[in-house]
Amino acid sequence: MNKIRKGDEVIVITGKDKGKRGVVLAVGENRVTVEGLNIAKKHVKPNPMKGTTGGVEAKAMPLNISNVALVDANGKPSRVGIKVEGDKKVRFLKTTGAVLSA
């Protein structure tokens, strides 16, 4: 069970974007892509077959999953725990104890 999932609001705790918040767009093996953070400029070749024009576009690049933390209701970073309720595993915030949606 992944502790951080697509759609979670996270805050960056280390790196050039430290303190910034965003929503998780994608989760990989050990990496997460966060909307509007860790932006890099990628050069794109024009492709007349697809109808794309060339140029330089800004793209959100993945961050290491250890560099982000979930945001609790108070707006502070929180670690995530996993506990069993009934027959299902649920995620909860360690700062407030609030259960996250399954």
Swiss-Prot record:
GO terms for molecular function: rRNA binding; structural constituent of ribosome. Keywords: Ribonucleoprotein, Ribosomal protein, RNA-binding, rRNA-binding. Disulfide bonds: none annotated. One of its GO terms (biological process) is translation. GO terms for cellular component: ribonucleoprotein complex; ribosome. Gene3D superfamilies: 2.30.30.30. InterPro entries: KOW (IPR005824), Rib_uL2_dom2 (IPR014722), Ribosomal_uL24 (IPR003256), Ribosomal_uL24_CS (IPR005825), Ribosomal_uL24_KOW (IPR041988), Translation_prot_SH3-like_sf (IPR008991). PANTHER family: MITOCHONDRIAL RIBOSOMAL PROTEIN L24 (PTHR12903). One of two assembly initiator proteins, it binds directly to the 5'-end of the 23S rRNA, where it nucleates assembly of the 50S subunit. Belongs to the universal ribosomal protein uL24 family. NCBIfam families: rplX_bact. Part of the 50S ribosomal subunit. This is Large ribosomal subunit protein uL24. It comes from Paraburkholderia phymatum (strain DSM 17167 / CIP 108236 / LMG 21445 / STM815).
